[in-house]
Amino acid sequence: MLSRYNPADIEAALLQARGELPFPPGHRREDWAKAASALGGPLCSALLAAAERASASQPAPLPATLWLECKRTGQRETYERPRAARRQALANLALAECLEWEGRFLDAILDYAWAICEESSWALPAHQLDLADVDDPIIDLGVAMTALELAELDHLLGERLEPALRRRIRSEVDRRCFRPYLARHDFWWLYNTARRDVNNWNAVCNGGVVGAAIYLEKSPARLAAMIAKAARSLDDYLATFDEDGGSSEGPGYWSYGFGYYTVLAHLVESRTDGQVSFLDEEAIGQIARYPLRTVLSPGRYVNFSDCSRNVHFCRAHLAYLGRRLGIPELEGLANVQPLQPEKESLTWALRSLFCRPDPAAAAPTPAPHDYFRGMQWMIARYDPADPEALVLAAKGGHNAEMHNQLDVGSFIVHLAGESLVAELGAGRYTRDYFGPQRYEHLAASWLGHSVPVANGHGQLPGKERRATLIAHIASPAEDCLALELREAYPQEAGLASLQRRIYLHREPPAGWVELEDLARFGSGPGMLESPLITFAQVELGPGYVLLRGSRACLRVQYDEAALKVRVEEFANVDLAEGPQDVRRVAFSWRAPSREGRLHLRLIPGQG
């Protein structure tokens, strides 16, 4: 447990340590020349060009009425986009100045950094709908990330910054972050409570605030108190992972939350000469391997809950973890991630220059079988060495997970780099998507998932709405996940039992997926429907349905005598990655029955 670290021992470690930080300030020209050489001419040029564009412009205005757009209309982007543009410009300017060290970006850095310090709040309006009360600052994701970015700006440029700006950074970070962090215990993201559990916010907020303190806080006692508080808090974050290192938030939020956990761990180890380590916990190795175990095909990952369908990891995060923990596969995965420092935050762009993967590390090959026991996630691969081969991902779990969707029993069928039976990922992030109307959005509702419908009733939210594991089988011939789903449904559904069994069979030439739903109704005959959610084109034939994607085709075979099928179209569904047409292919019994079976065979490449 990280809470074994108490303030007294941490303060002693701080006083004994040399206190070196992992990233060189800009005046260490030899280090920066090596970084520029490793980055390469084209990427350096792109970074300098981005800085020149920022230098030729002014910080985008952020008027109070723009803040209120989220409260008034529910839209977040109108404020978040110009806010993010300010921080991106500052990151590019700071790194360009460190690469050149000629002073030509210093005035623009002053303008952008001063404008950020002038913001009434660094929070996001979605997290604080009313205009900010400057006398009662909150700490959210935006506050914590901004604090770390300004602290690292100060570290990199030091005395080249205007003295007043350096004083302002310290004053603002102390007022907005350090004082409320030490004084308050009621931020929802700090600890697991009876009201709610923590999620990625815990790691990001702790990482940003305490990471900034490692750079800026001069009092060893005060810094020790913050590190100790973070240690206790981060124990609750680590508890959100299951015993196999799985996070129900998905790979995208793993990258975000565990990324900031790693940022803080790196800084704490450096500042204490390794006497305080957040990476020596037994669970860390399993958590670090999570992206290796959730891959569907290169660049595509299991995207249950609000996870994006297109996940990119921070190269520096994977590279550092791989080297620090002795997991070379993470360095191999880092090598196939995009490197675009001019599009990254200062936090990650800086690390991309100095935490580089071994270029000889090969892209990893996943295992045939992966299973996360606590979450009841199964990933089964027909041929892990073939990136085009069939992959099945299925889940149990419950309906109060982090970034929850009503998806107990849902699954993905992935072939040739695309999911033909798909998860929609997140809906567009708006005020309502995170409010009482969340489950009215197709992406979060049972209607937008490949889960059964009993007597017209879908699943309900709540931790008690869960799957019970019947069996998980992983063998050379097949993988199977068998679940009892009855508790996910309301009493009105009339279910005595609803079992789902889903298999990946490894029969040549390409394998196939089998879906078997077994329903028993308690009070009388009932109806069962099992849909497939897809972005693919749908073609109906006698006893089969074709799901035709851009690169592959899946043939869904069913018994016409027992089942009927209908196709529902949802045009321009408002998803986080943009509007997209979605199709729901619903198979159902032809007549009500007290009990029965719904059986589908999903066969690759039979178009």
Residue ranges of model-derived segments:
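Structural helix-adjacent loops and short alpha-helical linkers that scaffold large soluble proteins
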Residues: 97-110, 153-174, 213-231, 268-284, ...
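CBM-like, beta-strand-rich accessory domains located in the C-terminal region of large
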Residues: 129, 144, 331-343, 429-607
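Long, well-ordered core segments of solenoidal/helical folds
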Residues: 51-62, 109-125, 168-192, 225-245, ...
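Non-membrane alpha-helical segments in proteins
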Residues: 85-99, 111-115, 144-155
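Active-site lining segments of carbohydrate-active enzymes
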Residues: 131-252, 263, 350-363
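Carbohydrate-active enzyme catalytic cores, enriched for enzymes
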Residues: 258-420, 474-475, 591-592
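Solvent-exposed loop and edge beta-strand segments that line ligand/cofactor-binding
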Residues: 21, 74-87, 98, 126-143, ...
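Extreme N-terminal leader/anchor segments
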Residues: 1-47, 84, 95-98
